[in-house]
Amino acid sequence: MESMVAPGEVLMSQAIQPAHADSRGELSAGQLLKWMDTTACLAAEKHAGISCVTASMDDILFEDTARIGQIITIRAKVTRAFSTSMEISIKVIVQDKFTGIQKLLCVAFSTFVAKPVGKEKVHLKPVLLQTEQEQVEHNLASERRKVRLQHENTFNNIMKESSRFSDSICNEEEGTATTMGTSVQSIELVLPPHANHHGNTFGGQIMAWMETVATISASRLCHGHPFLKSVDMFKFRGPSTVGDRLVFSAIVNNTFQNSVEVGVRVEAFDCQEWAEGQGRHINSAFLIYNAVDDQEKLITFPRIQPISKDDFRRYQGAIARRRIRLGRKYVISHKKEVPLSAQWDISKKGSLSNTNVEALKNLASKSGWEITTTLEKIKIYTLEEQDAISVKVEKLVGSPAHIAYHLLSDLTKRPLWDPHYISCEVIDQVSEDDQIYYITCSVVNGDKPKDFVVLVSRRKPLKDNNTYTVALRSVVLPSVPSSPQYIRSEVICAGFLIQAVDSNSCTVTYLNQMSDSILPYFAGNIGGWSKSIEEAAASCIKFIENATPDGLKSVL
């Protein structure tokens, strides 16, 4: 573990005692949130030099668990200061004191606002950047802030869009459970020990109480042991003080295979407001849980069947938030991508080609695809796994399957319909059905353009099925080294599956298991602030349907 404390960084170490743990002997998520909020607040005040209050804590990801007897270290530092607010990066490491083994336990980002005395104006000093990683985080902080600021508009737009195809989403997979029995309400009286050093209710304490009622709500659905996996955002809308009554209301909103979203609302009442029944909405959060059974196996949650209008609003809201959450993953943190491309070896071309095709088929057959968008001829799905996000786009095309196959298997034609592709050329004709292409793509997020070296393996249907396959994956070819003009990027697994509907139409399914280098092209669409996937899909349909006999001569 790093022992040195960097300038501007605050470090807290805690030995986990029984009082900090839940019934399973694991560190309570609520207790951890209290410690994280305290550490982040002190980091903010160290930079600002004046009192600071929590505005929000978001993108909280729990990577592991900690148990009684282990030691945790919380590191918090300001990544960027804006005019009156700061983003604080929080990282929690757990260490076993017997083995010395360390693991990443949790990461999160908090936003704190400086609170001057009286009417004094505040303009926070910039963060002094000393390392390349600090510069990266400083730049990403600006991107994360943009996502936060546009969150409400993005959410409202997705909700508006989803209302047009709500029946399609609900009917995609019939729900079997209702959320009626998951409603939880609890009350807390704010006492002096619950207040922070400013006299307001300690934000970490409010988050801990919220986590408690959310856990109870999740347990009522799963009948197992729920554990907190992530939190979209704790958003503090207003303060509360000693003497306030805080009412916490929690209910399950929706389920996604092995996860469940629970929404929590907090209202504060002073003595007069309590008598009048007029509270103040001071906080909201959406907590995502996994759960295990008595054999410690992950539970698959039942699909939710919304019944009332409010059920449906919450059901759709959870889908929208999940979509935004997936889309903003690439701006949460910066990690160096591990090379995944296969080394091209002509003596193993058969094996590499077959592996390419099988990987695409396996991706398509995975369970857990969640629909995010439905249009007249287009459906978009996402699949969130432990370390990967994949996208699937189904298109109904008014053209024979063999025509679509010939057009899509010739990647030199892709720049004609895909706005991300600048150029695409064959650099190695391996066989009749396997080619290696060099591809250049457009600039994204103001960076340098990206280039790819990919193996394309195409297969016509076998006798026992009617599926045409076009599979892509990156390979390393010594004759095409990386260039300083481009960022050499990778395709893990992508391609098209084409099935005939009748003699004059087909279904084209595009799949892509996204690498870090490809995710920026898709993130805005998945997250709801771009329509690039829909636009590319519509362009692809138009390209195939409008293909002329002359345009097909080279591929037929």
Swiss-Prot record:
Matching entries from Pfam families are given as:
4HBT, START
Matching entries from InterPro entries are given as: Cytosol_ACT, HOTDOG_ACOT, HotDog_dom_sf, START-like_dom_sf, START_lipid-bd_dom, Thioestr_dom
**Which chemical reaction does it catalyze?**
acetyl-CoA + H2O = acetate + CoA + H(+); butanoyl-CoA + H2O = butanoate + CoA + H(+); hexanoyl-CoA + H2O = hexanoate + CoA + H(+)
Q: Where does CoA bind?
A: T54, A55, S56, S83, T84, S85, R145, K235, F236, R237
A Gene Ontology cellular-component term = intercellular bridge
Instruction: Report the residue ranges that make up the HotDog ACOT-type domain in this protein.
Output: 6-118, 180-295
Predominant subcellular localization, coarse grouping? cytoplasm
Q: Which SUPFAM superfamilies match?
A: Bet v1-like, Thioesterase/thiol ester dehydrase-isomerase
Query: Which UniProt key words apply to this protein?
Result: Cytoplasm, Fatty acid metabolism, Hydrolase, Lipid metabolism, Repeat, Serine esterase
Which PROSITE patterns does the record match to this protein? HOTDOG_ACOT, START
Entry function: Catalyzes the hydrolysis of acyl-CoAs into free fatty acids and coenzyme A (CoASH), regulating their respective intracellular levels. Preferentially hydrolyzes acetyl-CoA.
- Residues in START domain copies: 327-536
Annotated EC? 3.1.2.1
From the UniProt record, report the name of the gene that encodes this protein: Acot12
Q: Pathway listed for it?
A: Lipid metabolism; fatty acid metabolism
Give the UniProt subcellular location, in the record's own words. Answer: Cytoplasm, Cytosol
Activity regulation here? Allosterically regulated by ATP (activator) and ADP (inhibitor). Cold labile, it dissociates into inactive monomers at low temperature.
N6-succinyllysine modifications at: K34, K97, K160, K229
What is the top EC class of this enzyme, as a single word?
hydrolase
One molecular function GO term is: identical protein binding
A single GO BP: acetyl-CoA metabolic process
Q: How does it assemble?
A: Homodimer or homotetramer.
Q: Where is the signal peptide?
A: none
Task: State the protein's name.
Answer: Acetyl-coenzyme A thioesterase
Superkingdom field: Eukaryota
